[in-house]
Amino acid sequence: MVTYRFVEADTPALRRLPFERMESEGIARAVIWNRVDPCLLDWLECVNPQYAFCWLAHDRNNALAGTVWLNPVMGLCGCVHFCIFKAARPDWKNLGRQAIAHLFQARPLAGLLAVWPAHYRYVTRAAKHWGFGKPALLPKACHMPGIHKPARCRDGLMAVLQRKNFNLEA
């Protein structure tokens, strides 16, 4: 089992790295789904240190395997976001679990909220595997503009993972 090392993206150069990888893998639009053609500035807005914490996950060879970012929501709850890069996707269960453990160890969080487009079935599967509760439907919650439909909104799902229900030791 791979053990990932998490580094806080606390400089502009570190915060830029995930977007460069997203672009090279052709997944920037899937990750930054509220923009028709996401650019670096859109990504930097997502991980702006004024309202987000961002960590980079590196594998044993120090290659960037993924990124996780957290927006504090209310009190001790944060909205969590993941991006797992191609080389690490076969290990998504392990990487996601380690990312969640890292978040709970790095911040005094009572729970994590995840919100995603309902048609992203792989995210629904991942949320279930990582221990998030049953997803609830949020009608038209995800602004996903298209070139010809700039106001398009799609249904979203949301789920919660409470610290007390997550085994940090596993």
Language-model features: locations:
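Acyl-donor (CoA/ACP) binding surface of acyl/acetyltransferases
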Residues: M1-L17, R21, G26, Y51-A88, ...
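Active-site rim helix/loop that mediates acceptor-substrate recognition in acyltransferases
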Residues: I32-Y51
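Residue-level signal for secondary-structure boundary elements
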Residues: I27-V31
